[in-house]
């Protein structure tokens, strides 16, 4: 299941060269999401904090770098070898809105 969430906070993950920790508001709850953005973006905090994006939320929690990720950021381009971009709604929608 895909839902829109507001990226409220972006933080570095100690001991990881790739991961950032996102705090994401989904309307009914906040989730921690770990994403490998540090190697893709010069300043992930400035680029994505405060923006809405699409997340996969029906995955089992996954432990990475000693922390638990409760969803997965949906991005476009990584599989094709281009710098990934976020899947964003064209205008603001309620946090937690479902895609599809």
Sequence positions of predicted segments:
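Phosphate-backbone binding interfaces of nucleic-acid-interacting proteins
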Residues: 1-100
